[in-house]
Amino acid sequence: MTPVVEIELVDRSMSQSNAMLSGLGISPGLAVGQAFVFRDILHDLERYDIGTHQVEYEHGRIERAVERVLADLGLSAERVEAELNTDLALIFRAHEAMLRDPVLTKELREELEQELVNAEQVVKRVFRRWERRFRAMASEELRGRGDDVADLGRQLLQALAGIRTHVLENMPPNSVLVATRLLPSDTVHLSRKSVVAVVAEFGGPASHAALLTREMGVPAVTYVSAACDAIASGDTVLVDGFTGMVAVAPDAETEAGFEERVAEQRASWAAARERCHDPATTLDGVATAVMANIGCREDAVLAAENGADGVGLYRLEQLYLSRKALPTEDELLEIMRSTVEPVAGKPITVRLLDVGADKKLPSVDLSSEVNPFFGRRGVRVLLAYPELLHTQLRALVRLSRERDVHILVPMVTLAQEMKRLRELLVAAMAEVGAKRQPPLGAMIETPAAALCVAEIMKHADFLSIGTNDLTQYTMAAGREDPLVSDYFRDDHPAVLRLLRLVFEAVGNTPLALCGELAGRVDVLPFLLAVGIRSLSVAPPLVPTVKWTVRQIRLK
């Protein structure tokens, strides 16, 4: 965990010249700028003992710090909601909930009463313990929440110290931010007018900072070893968010060549955006549907603006996870109806709720899982909690009366799961008096599902391959784990062979591809060559993917 933060603006005369650093690209794009290095400095926080008569005073300091941080979190959520989207604002709403947790409040009080030390030491010790608990958890997603705990602890210590202004608010224009780790409270202070790219030593593609930088359209590279030591403030830095390469203080020839690539990228993006509403058809006439992944209405608006042919993956998780109580059937229907309104008239694939023990749902206890990624998740949870599934099926059947709705079942492993889902869907139709059955599809996300796809498709109207989890389970490597990041390759031959195997088995059953791989323009020729004709990508990528399809000749 990082206690009180101060900023060290590193400006060394002996920085590395023309050095090439490598990491993991977590937000695509190319950028050139001047390095702005900032790091959290671990201080020997002032420590002093207190008497029992001073406990209330120190506790009052903690309470006031909590209230100040809660106010700041509220402002951060409002800012992100206004400038980016509602889903990302939920990051800060979740931080508010964590800070209000009565268990945390009790532990802070007990630490103060038992140890009789000042408020700063109490906050430091308690949040360090909480961070270690999260870092030790089996679930990759829960381990990632250690960043959230560290962030909150740091903000409380800043509040106790009276630090108000965040240095990132005063970054000069054309800056490449170089940091040890970028936490959500840092990211919210970034300005598109100032920061052109981010380089960090830690933070995976599913981190909150990654989500925020992608939404801002800022190229970002993480897992760059010793970045804060290898790069000095003021250095010219070239950042390739596609390949994860970072060039420091490049020579004139290298910089000129990179500037040409940046200009080409801008020109191609402009051309792609201009034709984003045109069909994506290869040079030899093969049509490909380029759909969008969405999680909220703002995503749907962007998808429509960028020419998406429909919604290939509507995720319901944020809808559920942002609530204190499970939505009723009517509430769920109204939210989904409002969300998909911007893409009216186009096909919409809604994935049933995909949760496990790594995602806490109100009124649903999944905490007993030994390993959430190898336990009950996706369809397994839905079948274990029939009412949770029943509400979704009824709402989706009702929505299908108004929209071209397809229902996608997550994390299917066995054909029996799809058979049971079909039975429950038919029952839900009878209950609401619906005559037309929405197409029911299976998500292929595990090697078992890929190898047994012939049996699964007997009970499915369509299939969708989720390459993120398929890669994770095939390569036995988590996306967030830097120790195995070299193994997490969605273009590895093992993954691509599974894709080919699935396509060869499906025959005339419609098949779509979603996940990070679907937006990889370098892999598009292979995907189209094996027969993929429907791709679902993040809304900002739709124009580029459609433009790339038009440059490909298959025969």
What are the language-model segments listed below?
Residues A270-K555:
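Conserved alpha/beta-domain cores
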